[in-house]
Amino acid sequence: MAENRRIQKVNSLIREAIANVILKDVKHPKISNRWITVTRVCLSKDLHTARVYVSIMPHENTSAETLKALKASAGFIAYRASKGVFLKYFPEISFYLEDIFSPQDHIENLLWKIREQDKN
């Protein structure tokens, strides 16, 4: 139980550090011009690897390009984030897209279609 609490705290610290690096230090045009939210971090039990889940706005066609740029910049992001988190080993990070907007978009599209049908 104490180990789970420790991993949760480290997840939170790493999430904040990575979010700050993406916001302040990354100058890549496909990253800096997007609204990127680090939604969660999942560390392995040995704390050597971390899956970083992000949501990207605008979401339409740019999220794949932005995710590719994040993956290419993962080493730089991990290096800069490691300066703000004091761990013996900073985990190797990999980025994954968390698609939290699709259900909302789907509902909004359905409502839009209903409104259009009511007008006709």
Swiss-Prot record:
Mind telling me which GO cellular component terms the entry cites? cytosol
A GO MF term:
ribosomal small subunit binding
Q: Can the keyword Cytoplasm be found in this entry's annotation?
A: yes
BP terms from Gene Ontology: maturation of SSU-rRNA
Query: Which N-terminal stretch is annotated as signal sequence?
Result: none
InterPro entries membership: KH_dom-like_a/b, RbfA, RbfA_dom_sf
Location in the cell: Cytoplasm
So which domain of life are we looking at? Bacteria
- What exactly does this protein do? One of several proteins that assist in the late maturation steps of the functional core of the 30S ribosomal subunit. Associates with free 30S ribosomal subunits (but not with 30S subunits that are part of 70S ribosomes or polysomes). Required for efficient processing of 16S rRNA. May interact with the 5'-terminal helix region of 16S rRNA.
Q: Which NCBIfam families match?
A: rbfA
Binding partners and assembly: Monomer. Binds 30S ribosomal subunits, but not 50S ribosomal subunits or 70S ribosomes.
Family recorded in the similarity comment = Belongs to the RbfA family.
The protein depicted here goes by the name Ribosome-binding factor A
Its source organism is: Chlamydia felis (strain Fe/C-56)
